[in-house]
Amino acid sequence: MSGHSKWATIKRKKAVTDQKRGSLFTKLVKEITIAAKMGGGDPSGNPRLRLAIDTARSNSMPMDNIQRAVKKGTGELEGVIYDEITYEGYGPAGIALIIETATDNRNRTVADLRHIMSRNNGSLGESGSVSWMFQRKGSLEVPVSAASEEALMEALLEAGLEDLSNDGGETYTVITDVRDLEAAKKALEEQAIAFENAKMDLIPENYIELEAEDARKVIKLIDALEENDDVQAVYSNMEISESAMNSLED
């Protein structure tokens, strides 16, 4: 999972910029609204909504905003109806991309994505063209200061732990089956071990390792996609080499 951890490091740094763009709250509101629409407005009985609310709160979204988003999802307040659509394609150096969107206008979204991809040496593919390369997993991150690797293993062994990795950075990356993410969160809470960025993730079966030049191109494309208000998440099978990581962090 080393590639996942390295890319996670880049994404954590990008998140600060994303929030400044004002796009983060838009994406979080959409996720809360969709989760409430699909599974009801009670987070205790709706794991997706509970996760969305936890993510919003960890990013300092006011409770009023969260509650309005929930009520729009349940129909208590009038709101936009979003469709969830997943697109697949390729970026520079043959990197596989999965783009999850929430949109009120499918034609606008696909036109925007085609434009972004074509301007950044990428292309959209057919449904199923790259999704077979990925598996849906639960993931979360634990600061290395919060627990030792041994303590994490012990806490999570009976809570669905599938993979635990650290690339020498400031966090451990924990991977679980999607059905075990809540159990993993609960296990860490019971041991008073701090964690962050708990989410459903798409993990590639295999990675393509890139050097700095190609990695920059892929990151530029992913940045452009994530700036689009309809895009909720972008996943890739990019792994960044050690030398490229050092170059990108300079």
Swiss-Prot record:
GO terms for molecular function: DNA binding. InterPro entries: Integrase-like_N, TACO1_YebC-like_2nd/3rd_dom, TACO1_YebC_N, Transcrip_reg_TACO1-like, Transcrip_reg_TACO1-like_dom3, YebC-like. Keywords: Cytoplasm, DNA-binding, Transcription, Transcription regulation. One of its GO terms (cellular component) is cytosol. SUPFAM superfamilies: YebC-like. The keyword Membrane does not apply. It holds the Pfam family Transcrip_reg. One of its GO terms (biological process) is regulation of DNA-templated transcription. Signal peptide: none annotated. The keyword Cytoplasm applies. PANTHER family: TRANSCRIPTIONAL REGULATORY PROTEIN YEBC-RELATED, TRANSLATIONAL ACTIVATOR OF CYTOCHROME C OXIDASE 1. Belongs to the TACO1 family. This is Probable transcriptional regulatory protein Plut_1643. It comes from Chlorobium luteolum (strain DSM 273 / BCRC 81028 / 2530) (Pelodictyon luteolum).
